[in-house]
Regions:
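Conserved class I S-adenosyl-L-methionine
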Residues: 1-32, 45-49, 68, 126-151
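Short conserved AdoMet
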Residues: 29, 55, 73, 106, ...
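Class I SAM-dependent methyltransferase SAM/SAH-binding core
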Residues: 35-87
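Conserved Class I S-adenosyl-L-methionine
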Residues: 43-45, 161-259
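A short acidic, Gly/Pro-enriched loop at the edge of an enzyme's catalytic core
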Residues: 85-96
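A short SAM/SAH-binding and catalytic strip from SAM-dependent methyltransferases
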Residues: 95-108, 131
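A short glycine-rich, Lys/Arg-flanked "PGG" loop and its adjoining helix->strand segment in the class I
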Residues: 109-124
Length: 259
């Protein structure tokens, strides 16, 4: 899977995208972790929250995208380029945070089980994954990409890696780390957006990144133009010009048993 990330486009909805991260981290009860790892740090603007929360911890950050790593470094984060599939918690990795990353990884359930099992005693694993695959924003894009007009240019279409339910992740994590405290839930955030194509702008910065990598600039602009009226019909603005965009997210926090 190729992802062509645009940090500036991704950050266009900073306030909205930050809230799930903050909600996730607020449920992590670690007091004095030795090492905190941010897997999929993106442009690094939220990694600083971890450093502020745990100022005495070593904070490590990584992302698979070289553009995101460069943006994170510009934000003062000592990020490295790495694939989350290669990560294993070390003996002092007391907190692992993965926010809006694992839905890109087909085998993410295996990763969660491995990370949970490898955490040191008392360690915490905190994960958030977008679960909006069945929403109109995604189904409209998926159907359009499967049409005769677009299937030849994007034969892989819009990938869907099957984000699970909170119960599924709770059972998986509890089995992977017997005796752990597991807290899983889901939240649908309702984002007030403005602009001519607000939902299109949102998914252009995230969901459609693999598609963007497969298209020329001209094809990408044509796809955006094809999508825009369909998305506006599904998400019409109210009388004040606000488009209300619902976005489901699934959370899981595990606290490994202590010594």
């Amino acid at each position: 899977m190729t992802l062509l990330w645009d940090p500036a486009l991704y950050r266009r909805h900073d306030d909205h995208r930050a809230r799930p991260f903050l909600d996730l981290v607020s449920r992590v009860g670690a007091i004095a972790p030795r090492e905190v790892v941010d897997l999929g740090c993106g442009p690094g603007h939220l990694t600083g929250v971890l450093a502020q929360r745990w100022p005495d911890a070593r904070v490590r950050a990584s992302d698979a995208s070289p553009d995101m790593v460069a943006a994170a470094r510009d934000n003062g984060v000592d990020a490295v380029q790495a694939d989350v599939r290669d990560f294993t918690p070390g003996p002092e990795t007391d907190v692992v945070v993965s926010n809006a990353v694992l839905h890109w990884v087909p085998e993410h359930r295996d990763l969660l089980a491995r990370w949970a099992a490898a955490l040191p005693a008392g360690g915490r694993l905190a994960v958030q994954v977008p679960g909006n695959e069945s929403s109109p924003s995604h189904t409209i894009a998926r159907d359009l990409l499967a049409s005769e007009a677009w299937a030849p240019q994007v034969p892989d279409g819009l990938a869907a890696y099957g984000v699970g339910t909170p119960e599924e992740y709770a059972r998986l994590l509890a089995a992977a780390r017997p005796g752990a405290h597991v807290d899983c839930w889901e939240t649908t955030y309702l984002h007030p957006l403005t602009g001519d194509d607000p939902v299109g702008d949102w998914i252009a910065g995230t969901t459609l990144r693999p598609v963007r990598a497969a298209l020329t600039d001209a094809e990408w602009e044509r796809l955006r133009a094809d999508l825009a009226p369909r998305l506006r019909a599904a998400y019409p603005p109210d009388d004040a010009g606000t488009t209300w965009f619902g976005f489901r997210r699934v959370f899981a926090v595990l606290a490994a048993p202590g010594d």
